[in-house]
Amino acid sequence: MTRAMYMSKLYAPTLKEDPADAELASHRLLLRAGMIRKEAAGLYSYLPLAWRSIRKIENIVRDEMDAAGAQELMMPIMVDAELWRESGRIDAYGKELVRFDDRHGREFVLGPTHEETVTALVRNELRSYKQLPVNLYHIQDKFRDEFRPRFGLMRGREFIMKDAYSFSATQESLQEEYDKMKQAYANICERCYIKALPVVADSGEIGGDTSVEYMALADAGEASLVYCDDCGFAADDEAASTKVVVTEGPGDGTLTKVETPGMGTIEAVAKFFGFPENGTRKSLALIDAEGKPVVAIVPGDHELNDCKAEHVFGKGYRMMTDEELQTYGLHKGFIGPVNLPEGIRLVCDENLRESKQWACGANEVDYHFTGACPERDFTVDEWADLVTVVAGDPCPHCGKPLSAARGIEVSQVFQLGTKYSEAMGATFMDEDGKEKPLIMGCYGVGVSRSLAAVVEQHNDEHGIVWPVSVAPYEVAVIPLDPKKEECANVCDQIVEGLCAEGIEVVVDDRDERPGFKFADNDLMGFPYQVVLGKRGLKNGTVELKDRATGEREDLAIDEVVAKVAELVKAARR
């Protein structure tokens, strides 16, 4: 049996107007519905309604993790910085890592993830293959000092995450754990009513060479992804690769210098030659992470992918300044591979490797080359995957055109391999008595992000439309005249009946106008509303409203409890 909550006592301060700084629907509606409040940039308090939904998401996560054989524990938020030095991540992570000294001058970090902590935890305990595999998880606040916190709960500095870590003796065992987690994450999304697409992803600072993200599709999502309707391939734009169809440039194959006055853009050059932008070559002057000059070249109609560029040029690479261009003898808008000044590394996109006729800058103001050919006219120092894949590019699996979408990352799985165990000396004895590093996987679910993703996918012009499984309350009982004895008695009867059925009920007993109550309840988004109106009570009926469909149905007072209980229990996941 559950206990009802009464809105006269509920702390849920709703807002009539949209907050000025709320960009996403989820941010706007969670603020307006009295569910979260901003304390500082990227820091939010979860008010009672949101916290109930958070706990439901956490419990769904626990159900699926436990069913997959994982074990829950709790590790400290405050982590000894020496562990991060052991792994080599303390500097690589950058300024997002919150670092501080305690009163004794010992350095600590606030954990954004816990690979180091869990590896240190098990390295003296998991010593034999007989103890493996093991999968450990916890649900905890995390901290990342985001440069630009935005989108409400989507990109905050403090957030709630479930992170799990598996330890295996063999690659085959890791694959089994990885597959279990992928299935668990698919189940979590389904039970939370999040429409999510598993996409190939970049492993980023966490590491490893295999990763999949679960992206909640949303027009206002922060991440870009591409997918194939034909074969099902999907990847985020940081990891997506393809074979771009490259057009050969104009000319007869002979290296020819052409005057192009004032034409310092791809668009202007393509128009001048009467050729598609794909037939030109875009040259970008960069400074790599070591401070050395680089020119990167990609097809003219594609952009340099920042994540891929970090893999090639190092984290912290950047575009050259105007002063640096002058220092290295380069001219903005007219940079190219032919006659490139000495000491500048040339890296070209892999898609250009087979192209033998380039239209590109001539490294001289107001001039371009046509017919430039790699190896004959210039030497490429490195070929690499550099471009951002876009809609219309061919699928790398089946060759059909890719589609593009935006999404919200709600969870991600990684095969870490031995990155952390080797660095931190976490080893075990195998069947042959040989000492080997533990083989690791890690698996994260953004719990607070999932809350925002649900709202992002489930809302309308009136407010949030909660799915039953994660709704703060499943049913709102709305007596329009709660001070009248008949209305109060019927309300008590229905509430007691629903609570006896285990239904989670909130009662809008506030002394407010009906229109105000309807608007507030629609904004808060409880899945079902039972409305007790004067006319209906006179006829022995109440109105049942389905918040998702807007459908209304008059039910006899003695039938409403059974009907609502049936609907709610069927919709729970």
Q: What annotation goes with each model-predicted range?
A:
Residues 1-573:
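NTP/phosphate- and nucleic-acid-binding module
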